[in-house]
């Protein structure tokens, strides 16, 4: 059952990689396009948010929540964190953006009052051409919300991750250009995180190759982590969750 669930998430996540060309030759992930491909992702978003609401009545307060996009959605937390004293809840939604996370803070976080939050969000903003200022403002608003509504919650903010050339098998993407934007956005969010008293965890540096791309052995499609990549993420963040 778990394998089927993860397969469904993976297929949904891959559908985000349909692209359209921009005048400068950059590519957009279809999640962020205003045409019909977005409707499927919007439906998935709505279904996930509704599912979170149903889960909340059965979830314990004071646990750990991972929140983000498809990289989080695909992360089988039970395989890596079952030995912790606290439960880990996955609030990732494939194709999500900073705007999407901001819209669902109540159901994803506030309702279950976690003591620790692990946030990774922003790659779909970058690949969708969202202006940096808008993304950073949304990111700040997310952290503002946590600070106001969950004042005692410890928050760990993961770096946005690079892509690898494997993505070129399904989409025409300017990998060096997009990865440069990822690095710039990571620099943009660092002071925001620090200003809130939260912890920035640099996973990018641990998964990059000599060309600052996602190492091919850590991904099957060029953007999402596989089990090798999840192991590195786990090794980085788990000591903070003990």
Residue ranges and their predicted role:
Residues 105, 139-143, 186:
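Generic structural signal for well-ordered alpha-helices
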Residues 132-142, 182:
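Charged helix-capping and loop-helix junction motifs
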Residues 92-94, 121-126:
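Cell-envelope and extracellular/periplasmic
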Residues 123-126, 144-182:
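Active-site segments of SGNH/GDSL-like serine hydrolases
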Residues 19, 23-113:
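Serine-esterase "nucleophile elbow" of acetyl-processing enzymes
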Residues 1-20:
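N-terminal Sec-pathway targeting helices
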Residues 164-242:
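Catalytic His-Asp segment of secreted/periplasmic serine-dependent ester chemistry enzymes
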């Amino acid at each position: 059952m778990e394998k089927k669930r993860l397969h469904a998430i993976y297929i949904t996540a891959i559908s985000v990689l349909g692209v359209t060309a921009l005048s400068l030759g950059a590519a957009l992930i279809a999640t962020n396009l205003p045409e019909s491909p977005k409707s499927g992702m919007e439906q998935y978003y709505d279904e996930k948010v509704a599912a979170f609401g149903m889960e909340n009545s059965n979830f314990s307060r004071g646990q750990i929540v991972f929140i983000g996009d498809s990289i989080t959605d695909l992360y089988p937390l039970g395989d890596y964190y079952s030995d912790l004293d606290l439960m880990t809840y996955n609030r990732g939604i494939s194709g999500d953006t900073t705007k999407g996370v901001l819209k669902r803070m109540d159901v994803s976080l506030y309702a279950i009052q976690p003591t620790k939050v692990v946030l990774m969000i922003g790659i779909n903003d970058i690949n969708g051409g969202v202006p940096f200022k808008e993304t950073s403002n949304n990111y700040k608003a997310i952290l503002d919300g946590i600070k106001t509504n969950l004042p005692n919650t410890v928050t760990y903010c993961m770096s946005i991750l690079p892509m690898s050339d494997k993505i070129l098998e399904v989409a025409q993407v300017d990998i060096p250009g997009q990865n440069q934007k990822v690095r710039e956005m990571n620099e943009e969010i660092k002071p925001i995180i620090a200003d809130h008293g939260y912890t920035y965890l640099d996973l990018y540096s641990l998964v990059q190759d000599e060309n600052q791309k996602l190492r091919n052995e850590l991904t099957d499609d060029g953007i999402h982590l596989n089990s090798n990549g999840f192991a590195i993420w786990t090794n980085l963040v788990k000591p903070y969750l003990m």
